[in-house]
Amino acid sequence: NDYYDVNLKNNRLKILQQYDKFTFQKQNLEDKEEIDRIFKKNSPNRVIHLAAQAGVRYSIEHPEVYIQSNIVGTFNILEGCRHNKVEHLVYASTSSAYGLNTKYPFSVHDNVSHPVSLYGATKISTELMAHSYSHLYGIPTTGLRFFTVYGPWGRPDMAMFIFVKKI
């Protein structure tokens, strides 16, 4: 999509392609048949699922993108894990899950039933789906609630990137 310049992702990819065991396949997570094919072809023991449509502001104007990528896409990953006997799934969530909580610091035990963005709601949904798959199908899962991720390859819409660029 047009969320930000695709060249940033392509430049990140060039760094990873230097590693012999790294492979890259560009696929839409919501394409269940293609995700199934990738799981069958590669037979992974462990899956690290970091793909998602990120960003709170973009979710206000493009909610369908978040439902498809985050919820449907994660469902397809979970199904791939279930049908291919994956030993462990690590997936990305977000600090947006904490929504209207006012207690600081946040805790994994805090209530997350009041998201204030569709983005946060989709990521909470993926956490609940992963928890259900763990319980129903015995797939160990670990969710990571990332806060603001920054660095030289950070997303250009993030405050830190904007501030540094203006200096």
Each language-model region and where it sits:
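Short alpha-helix within the catalytic core of nucleotide-sugar-dependent glycosyltransferases
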Residues: L78, M160-F161
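N-terminal Rossmann-like NAD(P)+-binding domain of SDR-like oxidoreductases, especially those catalyzing
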Residues: N1-V149
